[in-house]
Amino acid sequence: MNIDAVVEFTKKHLKDEKTGHDFYHGQRVANLASKMYLEDHPDAHADSRMVAIIKSGGYLHDTIDEKVCDNPDKVIAEIKELLPEVGFTDLEVWDILFTIQHMSFSANIEHHYHLPLSGQYVQDADRLESLGAMGIARAFTYGGK
């Protein structure tokens, strides 16, 4: 499955992002999440539907973040139109949307959401991305805003 349209959508929506929640963060999350999935599932193929779901969630997860998006509902509606055009089924669209709407730390403070397997990989990759040198750089950038 080709997710180039998802990548371009993310580039468009995060092009002016300066807090560390930019396209390159989404790309790192997408790549790390899919790498972890493939390491856990050695029989899976890099071009599998599950990898496409995981990568799409990784790319899209900050496009609806209120820190960087003025109108998350509008972007969610755009994503709902985009994903079927790419070839995702209704269930796959639901998995991706549920993940990006419920994976953040703040979304889980009062209620812990159980993400689909694909979302668990995206959430883990996003949290790992917040650690180390990149996480420190992003914290200084966002904290200075």
Where are these regions (language model features)?
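Short alpha-helical hairpin
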Residues: 1-11
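Alpha-helical architecture
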Residues: 20-23, 59-60, 124-127
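Generic hydrophobic alpha-helical membrane-span motif
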Residues: 67-68, 132
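His-Asp-centered metal-binding catalytic motifs of divalent-metal-dependent phosphohydrolases/nucleases
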Residues: 47-67, 75, 97-106
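Histidine/acidic-rich helix-loop-helix segments that form or flank divalent-metal centers
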Residues: 89-145
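Alpha-helical phosphate/pyrophosphate-handling elements in metalloenzyme active cores
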Residues: 17-54, 66-67, 82-86
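Post-HEXXH active-site segment of zinc metalloproteases
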Residues: 72-82
